[in-house]
Amino acid sequence: MYGLTTKNITNANGIQILKGEKVQCLFITELGNNCYEGLFVTETGIKFLSDFSNIKFILKEND
């Protein structure tokens, strides 16, 4: 799944991912109570964890 960040996010190493960056979801973890967290990676290879409220997903049909 691909998406865009909806706000600035700082990863565990202190690297900031800016609002509007294109990201890919690599892995999804269920946290319980209908909450989920994903492992995302930016186009430049920066990995970060985030809940799905910080990502707007891009959905498109196959051509």
Where on the chain are the PLM-derived regions?
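Residue-level signal for functionally critical sites in structured catalytic/ligand-binding pockets
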Residues: 18, 33, 63
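Secondary-structure transition/turn motif
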Residues: 7, 21, 41-45
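Intrinsically disordered, low-complexity, charged/polar segments
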Residues: 41-63
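SH3-family beta-barrel domains
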Residues: 1-9, 29-30
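SH3/SH3-like beta-barrel superfamily modules
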Residues: 29-47
